[in-house]
């Protein structure tokens, strides 16, 4: 970044500081990952200069013959990965992908069945502080009080009672496999559409290590980062019968020109997801998550649902007599990055919370394996149990530094 360094020292310094943070800390935020240098190169390419309103072959600007090729590559690769009939790779985010689906099939005030945010759902699944909860009549389903797993009988009962036009499956903090086939059966029974938000698990689905929602859902939305390990962005997969409507909902419905440099980066990431080593990577994510969950439980920590089936673990910190906010802060102080998170049947404020959400996608990309998961479990427990002991926290910092120094990040940057 020689040009940036010469031209804008302040921005360069901030970027260098962030690179230093990523190199020196253990990244456990479940929604984050480390992209390849090829993905970064595509996103930083001259495609950032090109306006391309519309779709390949039907643009409102000239000079789109090369970006058309890039977008077609991205769409074709997604179809190959997930078996989708139609794909739109233009959404700038997962939230905008969800918005486009809602705009396609719903009218203001329509009833939708979605997962309670504190039970693992997402803001765009009907939270009252989000457009989805303002524009539509969302009815919430959640998890069982004992098992902390989705209660499908309750979902069916609420679907029969409220007759939603759309049912939303998928989550941002649910560590278990979701039965998409069961959701489709429920949707069919009440005459509803089914949308699956697979943002967190898309990479695991791509590798064939998690059930694929595409055969069961009318619409599937996802981000392109997280376990899929691409640039920050979104996309929509749908049945061919909804293709024109979905495309119109994205453009000109809620977006203008697509970010062609980001779509190029998406295409590169999708190409990576088609390689054999991506399946190995995804399997390592799951193996690491299971090992980390086991280690945390051996240390006496409480896990929501008792473990994990995917990349995500939700820790209930109440038995440590601290809050999620305190846990996030003290872990960050020693070099472990997590996020505070609500837990099912939460009683604390969402700014305080009773839980911490962690994930293994980023550390797996970095090369961490089972032995490192044992050390991370020990570090998390040691830090939280000694959160007011500065000598113990200093010891934890040294252990984090010793661990991260073994796995250099982005050596060419």
UniProtKB/Swiss-Prot annotation:
Coiled-coil residue spans: none
The main location class comes to: cytoplasm
Catalytic activities: (6R)-5,10-methylene-5,6,7,8-tetrahydrofolate + glycine + H2O = (6S)-5,6,7,8-tetrahydrofolate + L-serine
- Keyword Cytoplasm present in the record's keywords: the answer is yes
Alphabetically sorted, this entry's keywords are:
Amino-acid biosynthesis, Cytoplasm, One-carbon metabolism, Pyridoxal phosphate, Transferase
Question: What pathway does the annotation place this protein in?
Answer: One-carbon metabolism; tetrahydrofolate interconversion; Amino-acid biosynthesis; glycine biosynthesis; glycine from L-serine: step 1/1
What function is annotated for this protein?
A: Catalyzes the reversible interconversion of serine and glycine with tetrahydrofolate (THF) serving as the one-carbon carrier. This reaction serves as the major source of one-carbon groups required for the biosynthesis of purines, thymidylate, methionine, and other important biomolecules. Also exhibits THF-independent aldolase activity toward beta-hydroxyamino acids, producing glycine and aldehydes, via a retro-aldol mechanism.
What's the protein here called?
Serine hydroxymethyltransferase
Organism whose genome encodes this protein: Bacillus cereus (strain AH187)
Question: Which gene carries the instructions for this protein?
Answer: glyA
């Amino acid at each position: 970044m020689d040009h940036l360094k010469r031209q804008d020292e302040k921005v360069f310094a901030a970027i260098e500081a962030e690179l230093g943070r990523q190199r020196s800390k253990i990244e456990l935020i479940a929604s984050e990952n480390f992209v390849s240098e090829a993905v970064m190169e595509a996103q930083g390419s001259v495609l950032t200069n090109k306006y391309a309103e519309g779709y390949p072959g039907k643009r409102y600007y000239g000079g789109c013959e090369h970006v058309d090729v890039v977008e077609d590559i991205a769409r074709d690769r997604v179809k190959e990965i997930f078996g989708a009939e139609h794909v739109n790779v233009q959404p700038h985010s997962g939230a905008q992908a969800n918005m486009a689906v809602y705009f396609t099939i719903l009218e203001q005030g329509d009833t939708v069945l979605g997962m309670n945010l504190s039970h693992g759902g997402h803001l765009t699944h009907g939270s009252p502080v989000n457009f989805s909860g303002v524009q539509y009549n969302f009815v919430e389903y959640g998890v069982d009080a004992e098992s902390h797993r989705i209660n499908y009988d309750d979902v069916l009962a609420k679907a029969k009672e409220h007759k939603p036009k759309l049912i939303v499956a998928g989550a941002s903090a649910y560590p278990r496999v979701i039965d998409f086939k069961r959701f489709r059966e429920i949707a069919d029974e009440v005459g509803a559409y089914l949308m699956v938000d697979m943002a967190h698990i898309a990479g695991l689905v791509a590798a064939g290590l998690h059930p694929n929602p595409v055969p069961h859902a009318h619409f599937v939305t996802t981000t392109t980062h997280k376990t899929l390990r691409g640039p920050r962005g979104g996309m929509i997969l749908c049945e061919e019968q909804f293709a024109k409507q979905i495309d119109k909902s994205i453009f000109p419905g809620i977006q203008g020109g697509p970010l062609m440099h980001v779509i190029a980066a998406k295409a590169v990431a999708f190409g990576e997801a088609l390689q054999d080593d991506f399946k190995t990577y995804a399997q390592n994510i799951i193996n690491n998550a299971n090992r980390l969950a086991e280690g945390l439980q051996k240390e006496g920590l409480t896990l929501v649902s008792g473990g994990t089936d995917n990349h995500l673990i939700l820790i209930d910190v109440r038995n440590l007599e601290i809050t999620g906010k305190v846990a996030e802060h003290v872990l960050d102080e020693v070099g472990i990055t997590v996020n505070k998170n609500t837990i099912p049947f939460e009683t604390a404020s969402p700014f305080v919370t009773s839980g911490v959400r962690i994930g293994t996608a980023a550390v797996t990309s970095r090369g961490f394996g089972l032995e490192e998961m044992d050390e991370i479990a020990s570090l998390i427990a040691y830090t939280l149990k000694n959160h007011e002991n500065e000598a113990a926290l200093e010891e934890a910092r040294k252990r984090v530094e010793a661990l991260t120094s073994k796995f250099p990040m982005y050596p060419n940057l």
